[in-house]
Amino acid sequence: MIPESIAAILLAVPLGTLVIQSVSYWSEFTKSEGRARSTEKAAYSKPYFYALVFGVLCMWVAWLGGMTLLALNRFESIFGWRAFQSHSALWSQISGFVVFYLGAVTYNLTLFAAGKYLRPAPSGIREEHRLVQEGPYGVIRHPLYVSYVLILLGLSLALRLYWLLIPTACILLGIYPTARAEEEVLVERFGEEYTAYKRRVGMLFPKLL
């Protein structure tokens, strides 16, 4: 079994780089929001969109909560109780952290590739928006959504939190309708450029040929 302090560090490392990128992103976003006008907005199906949002919120609760509780276990002798108890087998922890890191790295690379063009879903598209096709976007069209699923699956295995399969199912339920709604706007905005991008790059899975 992986020591709990090591497990907490493994959860914290990608979070640190994510926080740095998020601060930079929101700083740029708030500056540009005042001088840029949004145009098209996706017509989301609310039940599917809210299912996806619920899944993402659960992801953050499990990620931050698991990391914090594992760290608090270091003070068991002081508190007299354990904050979190995980009995995952070593193979489950290792495979879980591999899947978790695949998702976390994809998440970080997506933020880096998209930069200021990554928009909160309801905000719409800026007039000066460009189609990002680098990094993870060169492999699949919606890498951020896929990263959510990988992170949740990884956490469920690494921390033995099998209830996370419920929010994972919610995200899987909401991904396709939400992505389709966004792509309708992107096709309208970018025309043939996005149509060609769709032919070349898979939506949620890489195109092998």
Annotate each language-model stretch with its function.
Residues 1-130, 152-209:
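Membrane-anchoring alpha-helices and their flanking helix-loop junctions
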Residues 121-145:
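Active-site-proximal inter-transmembrane loops
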